[in-house]
Amino acid sequence: EVPQIMKDHFTLVAISNLQLGNGKFLEGATGLILDILARKPFWDRDLNFNHGTGHGVGYLLNIHEGPAGFRWKYRKGETEVLQEGMVITDEPGIYIEGSHGIRLENELLTCKGTLNEYGQFMYFEAITLIPMDLDAINPDIMNAEDKERLNTYHATVYEKVSPYLNDEEKEWLKKYTRAI
């Protein structure tokens, strides 16, 4: 059984990961602007994680490669605009000294969305499709939108991954991507 405080923290990390991963924004935005999407669930509870929320992933999966990333604090030279095709990690976490640490990471592909009179809208597509542990989720601290994001993410995981699995593996994946 997962202790309640760990469930609550895991749930906050999941909410944070999904809020950023579902972000929509106008072309010209930087990771500095969008980082608040991931940190808000923590900051609302006077919590934080002391690392950047994400970083670029480069050619041949080189890690921690610029030019873009997500962080709340300005650093000189890290103001690159997010562009179509950029892959950036979404990896919020929480670390309680002497107790536990939790981090969830997805890689996000930056995509163009609607172009209208307001400009070019952009969005992210999760390209790391792994279920989040539902046994560690506390649905009582999630609002309806949080639950919808999790259910939509899990439906996408099942839809895209299950065609590559045998029947037994599909049953396992179905159980771990069920709606809450």
Regions found by a protein language model. Name each.
Residues 1-180:
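Active-site neighborhoods and metal-handling regions in enzymes and metal-associated proteins
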